[in-house]
Amino acid sequence: MHKLLLSLLMGFSFITSNAQELPKNYGQLLKEVEPQLISWRRHFHENPELSNREFNTGKYIADYLKTLGIEVRYPVAKTGVMAILKGGKPGPVVALRADIDALPVVERVPLPFASKVTAEYGGQKVGVMHACGHDSHISILMATAKLLTAMQKEVPGTVVFLFQPAEEGAPGTEEGGAQLMIKEGLLDNPKVEAVFGLHINSQTPVGTLKYKSGAFMASADWFTIKVNGKGSHGSQPWGGVDPISASAQI
């Protein structure tokens, strides 16, 4: 886990100023934070919350960030968290973002920190699970905030930590996610020059950071198709329209 964090820190150092170097003791700092990082991840994995319902998750994050002595804004975008670290050297304003919501999935693994949480989703009682790695994302960004705060004098510019709710999509007609964070002006004060998201990937070697300019990871959206049929007598099917047959061909 600490290798993932190291990758993020190295990436941040390169992004803010390729002339900057991480402090010589960052390796020791990583080792010290690793047990806490693992503990956080297991806590969030065991206590997942659905989109726009991340009340306990957001509070847990905000309460910890406040102990670091940095500016914390909570709640934002319903259940999200924003924190600001002003570095000791001049530089850009860069945001690091992690998503915090879980999915309506039943966890079926024999782990001591497996989720047993249930919630209502779509009018049904469902299991809730961090099946997309957001528990890791939260923990990595919290640890990054801790380490960058510890080396605040060496940080060039300002770092904005964004813990985004409802990344998987706000339920129903609710607002949420990145759009709501932007709408509330979280990228305007301070004026963020670049935002870097974070996502783990089982196909990427541990300790490796992949990045590129512009958009990188795909997005998904929802749409509904309504197929209208036409009834007819069973002996005269040609007089009707079978919506099942038509739907199967879409």
Feature map (PLM): residue ranges:
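Acidic/His- and Gly-rich active-site-bordering loop/insert found
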Residues: Q20-M129, S139-P156
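Histidine/acidic-residue-rich, glycine-tolerant segments that coordinate divalent metal ions
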Residues: T118-M129, D135-S136, L148, K153-Q249
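Bacterial Sec-dependent N-terminal signal peptides
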Residues: M1-L22
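A generic structural signal for short
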Residues: L8, I15, L29, E49-L50, ...
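General alpha-helical segment detector with a strong preference for membrane-spanning helices
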Residues: L6, L103-V105, I138-S139, Q203, ...
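Metal-dependent amide/peptide-bond hydrolase catalytic core
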Residues: Q20, T67, I244-I250
